[in-house]
């Protein structure tokens, strides 16, 4: 896989996540007797952020476990494979957050929602993507058993985050009740996790034999 293939894969996966969240928003609003465009956009952008974050976990795990060894087997250097994987992750995150930002411009209070939703969404995409990356690396380094165990762990983490987010939304509203310090800390934590997973990827690609 060349660099443009990694970029293309990241873009396609991001567009699939965007389309899936949009369709889910449509289905949810069709069940609502009072359909309003502004509330439909608000609901859709919230689905986009959290669905995109969850899919970053699943997709990066799959790409790390499958596409990375495949790229090396077809002659890509370890340097090309590593940076290709990083480009995939960056393109996916950028497109998800760019789509969310553009959709927020169509809401009644775009800046109020953006001030909360974008930092939390970015943190979720980076953090869950990092977890997915670690899962893929464990599969490469220790085999299918480690990949399955990591997958189960990721599922438990995702369910826990989903339950917490659901309870928070019921209690405080979709974007309400968050202290300002969380809006600063969350993206920093997500970026830290992202960098940590990059280091683990680097060590894995350069120091371990990749099993096909």
Predicted regions and their residues:
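Hydrophobic alpha-helical transmembrane segments of membrane proteins
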Residues: 1-68, 80-212
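Short helix-to-coil transition segments within interhelical loops
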Residues: 72-77
């Amino acid at each position: 896989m060349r660099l443009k293939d990694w970029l293309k894969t990241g873009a396609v996966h991001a567009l699939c996540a965007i389309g899936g969240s949009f369709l889910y928003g449509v289905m949810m609003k069709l069940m609502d007797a009072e359909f309003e465009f502004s509330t439909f956009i608000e609901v859709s952008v919230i689905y986009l952020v959290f669905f995109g974050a969850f899919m970053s976990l699943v997709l990066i795990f799959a790409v790390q476990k499958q596409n990375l060894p495949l790229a090396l087997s077809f002659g890509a250097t370890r340097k090309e494979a590593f940076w290709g994987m990083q480009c995939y992750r960056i393109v996916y995150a950028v497109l998800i957050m760019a789509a969310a930002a553009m959709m927020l411009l169509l809401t009644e209070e775009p800046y109020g929602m953006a001030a909360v939703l974008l930092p939390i969404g970015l943190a979720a995409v980076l953090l869950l993507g990092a977890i997915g990356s670690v899962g893929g690396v464990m599969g490469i380094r220790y085999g299918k058993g480690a990949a399955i165990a990591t997958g189960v762990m990721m599922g438990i983490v995702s369910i826990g985050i989903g339950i917490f987010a659901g309870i928070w939304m019921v209690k405080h509203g979709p974007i309400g009740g968050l202290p300002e310090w969380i809006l600063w800390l969350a993206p920093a934590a997500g970026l830290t996790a992202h960098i940590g997973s990059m280091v683990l990827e680097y060590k894995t690609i350069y120091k371990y034999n990749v099993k096909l």
